[in-house]
């Protein structure tokens, strides 16, 4: 079930251009859609976030570096670890301009929070999951590196008890999901660039996104792959 509406453009823009943008800013953007945030009593070990992480009804929007080059990210495999239940083994690929690189790594979910919604929904419970990621571009090719940072997922428990991707507020201006923010460090030069990607929005991307209700790239970045 989804709810579609547009909040003021000023609200999301002020969050997007605030410097520096932090993981806390992302959390506040999502939780602003809800009445209350509180500790979650569910067990991370008993929850399987694979269907949330592999949700493919929408593609990632991502950017890298000071010029906000378009970053394409695709997960091809995610498996919950049998011995460490908060850890997920990840495989996928990235593309910047014409360079496509395979990666493998991990996502670790370490915190759950429950979100209280006053709207009528089909969910027993809604919340966010927070964690860390580390992805290694492992091929013997130029322009490879290490991605690392933090991840934020919006989830929901259905009335049937299933853990689902939460798109209830899709269409709301501040909404995004499956957000990753952090750095990419070149293996060749050891130089680090800021990186971020998510569904529907590019988190912490400054003036890249000028859209209200949907992502629209700023014209000055079109030459960087947008």
Task: Give the label of every model feature segment.
Residues 20-76, 85-95, 125-139, 143, ...:
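Tryptophan-anchored aromatic micro-motifs
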Residues 39-44, 67-75, 106-120, 142-169:
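Charged, amphipathic alpha-helical segments
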Residues 1-23:
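Bacterial Sec-dependent N-terminal signal peptides
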Residues 13, 169-172, 181:
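Active-site/pore-lining binding-face segments in mid-to-C-terminal subdomains
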Residues 100, 113, 190-192:
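Residue-level signal for secondary-structure boundary sites
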């Amino acid at each position: 079930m989804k709810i579609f509406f547009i909040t003021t453009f000023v609200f999301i823009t002020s969050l997007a251009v605030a410097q520096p943008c932090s993981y806390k800013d992302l959390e506040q953007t999502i939780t602003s859609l809800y009445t209350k945030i509180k500790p979650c009593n569910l067990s991370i070990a008993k929850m399987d976030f694979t269907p949330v992480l592999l949700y493919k009804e929408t593609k990632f929007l991502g950017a890298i570096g000071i010029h906000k080059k378009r970053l394409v990210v695709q997960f091809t495999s995610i498996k919950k670890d049998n011995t460490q239940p908060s850890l997920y083994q990840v495989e996928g690929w990235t593309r910047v301009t014409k360079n496509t690189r395979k990666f493998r790594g991990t996502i670790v979910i370490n915190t759950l929070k429950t979100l209280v919604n006053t709207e009528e929904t089909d969910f027993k419970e809604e919340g966010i999951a927070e964690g860390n990621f580390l992805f290694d571009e492992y091929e013997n090719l130029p322009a490879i590196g290490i991605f690392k940072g933090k991840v934020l997922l919006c989830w929901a428990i259905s009335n049937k008890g299933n853990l689902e991707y939460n798109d209830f507020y899709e269409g709301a201006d501040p909404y995004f999901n499956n957000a990753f923010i952090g750095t990419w460090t070149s293996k060749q030069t050891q130089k680090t660039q800021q990186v971020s990607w998510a569904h529907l929005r590019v988190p912490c991307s400054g003036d890249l996104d000028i859209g209200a209700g949907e992502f629209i790239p700023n014209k000055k970045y079109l030459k960087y792959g947008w």
